[in-house]
């Protein structure tokens, strides 16, 4: 109060007013405050104050030659007065308007290329459809989402190298472009940005948007792919949502979606093979998604999904430390436990050996359609707060939490025997047995759980065993909340190990993932997935198995032919014949195999009965474990197109048709390739011609190694001996001549000698 009086007093004196309004501010502290550093201390005030002046902008002197002094309205555009302290001119804001309307045009060709992500966004919005607005409570949960549609998946470091190479190609600095995607992008962008006049810094910013995935931890109630996130502010508020269908898709979302489908298919297939881990790796390495190798995508793509994480673990990559159970992602937020094996009795008096977690723990559970907070002690559920989209989703979460709690009343609620098996026909572990049992029918579980009266807590409500809401009673410890539970925000990744059966463990030995956790949901991939591994031939059904098997034999005929005569057992055990077995009726597989193997042996023994077409046609049948029987077959049955179709042992059929003239094989009407040699014509002439320059010494001699094909003979040195496989499937020993002079006589003697050697 005193100070104010004093100030008023001062202001009443005319001299004070004059000093404050007319003289310069010369207090050192104030001058320091407003002049130290380049940082503007009050930008908005400065801006308003500047724009109130007549000429707030400075420009290069050359502007006076490019812009008239006055515009059409006679307003002055620039001042003849120089800017104090520089040789620039003072310019009016009106000059900017004049320049925008009348200034020179530059080429705009590069704009859509540089601002590609913006142009594409406009197109998506133009073609998108906005539906009605609904007012309802929004259960949003924070998830890590991709906020940048249309990007490649380079790491920040990789992108930096690409940008430097594209924008500043002549700058010095070590940059190594190694990955295929880096090289492709660099080449593409250099081409696109020839003679680009846009400032390099801007180009660099825009390239970064295009190359790197940007994620944010945002509250989301609906779709999480980037084309939905870019309109999040338009589609969901606190109490409303607006329906929206994007007007286009972007490759990064398609890759994420296709990667999940490929990974699920591969994990499911690997789980049923003899060595799941080896098979999984073989498939990951031989699969392409949208033309890019799956292993490259796995290294770069941060998608977290059970199957994808199993594939990453197999490749030795780090994954999230949360674990999966019943399709929910669990993250322990506090507490700890030790594990102990314990035997328990089900309601059906079946003994189960379960690993009990002893100790108090709290978890967040996040699923696609429901989330929860779970507090538990040793074999006891203390509290479960669930929120979900609908009754069904809430029930799923409750079942998973009840099983996870390992409570006795849950185990006693089992009716009937637990004998669930996985795809490979192996029994599931006890926890998954229980889960499957209650997922089929949870009535008894919910009835036996017990109910309790509840307090009225804001935003919470009770739920009864029949899944109806209630404000008075609820299942013991269970409440339904209006608020969702956020996904675990940390993006930390941990080192994990994986065993032969694809169980992924953290360094403490806790199981984080297993094939049982991989969703059975089938989807159609957005990008083409090319599985080169024979294990995945069956993904497209029986016809694909049939065609692929025969294509494989034809492609590898040279080596197959040699193995057929030298080491048939090894050939029969090839994994490429595995998928074919599922097409042959189980009851007769063994007999077919025995019959075909006997037939092949006769071909090897009896001269001149080698028949290429027949070997190719029957070979896949010989792969099954043979049963010895006297049965003869004129045709063999395969199950395709919903019924048994016949392959004739001698001659063509719709299933297997070889055209002698074109040498093309068609399987079920689909082209299966061309045979490089003609199977049915007497090939002795051809062979004797090829054997010119070689002396035939006699029968095969094992000391000289496995039989070579005729094509491989050219590698022999003069005087070198080798076994060679000739057209009839017979093997003879030859020596490359030391002199060229006698070559002509070879072809005549060859034919005679072959006969003698064989007989």
From Swiss-Prot:
GO terms for molecular function: RNA binding; RNA-directed RNA polymerase activity. The keyword Transmembrane does not apply. InterPro entries: Flu_PB2_2nd (IPR049110), Flu_PB2_6th (IPR049114), Flu_PB2_C (IPR049115), Flu_PB2_CAP-bd (IPR048298), Flu_PB2_middle (IPR049111), Flu_PB2_N (IPR049106), INV_PB2 (IPR001591), PB2_helical (IPR049113). Pfam families: Flu_PB2_1st, Flu_PB2_2nd, Flu_PB2_3rd, Flu_PB2_4th, Flu_PB2_5th, Flu_PB2_6th, Flu_PB2_7th. One of its GO terms (cellular component) is host cell nucleus. A motif (Nuclear localization signal) lies at residues 736-739. Keywords: Cap snatching, Eukaryotic host gene expression shutoff by virus, Eukaryotic host transcription shutoff by virus, Host gene expression shutoff by virus, Host mitochondrion, Host nucleus, Host-virus interaction, Inhibition of host innate immune response by virus, Inhibition of host MAVS by virus, Inhibition of host RLR pathway by virus, Inhibition of host RNA polymerase II by virus, mRNA capping, mRNA processing, Viral immunoevasion, Viral transcription, Virion. One of its GO terms (biological process) is cap snatching. It comes from the Viruses. It is found in: Virion; Host nucleus; Host mitochondrion. Plays an essential role in transcription initiation and cap-stealing mechanism, in which cellular capped pre-mRNAs are used to generate primers for viral transcription. Recognizes and binds the 7-methylguanosine-containing cap of the target pre-RNA which is subsequently cleaved after 10-13 nucleotides by the viral protein PA. Plays a role in the initiation of the viral genome replication and modulates the activity of the ribonucleoprotein (RNP) complex. Influenza RNA polymerase is composed of three subunits: PB1, PB2 and PA. Interacts (via N-terminus) with PB1 (via C-terminus). Interacts with nucleoprotein NP (via N-terminus). Interacts (via N-terminus) with host MAVS (via N-terminus); this interaction inhibits host innate immune response. Belongs to the influenza viruses PB2 family. This is Polymerase basic protein 2. It comes from Influenza A virus (strain A/USA:Huston/AA/1945 H1N1). The gene is PB2.
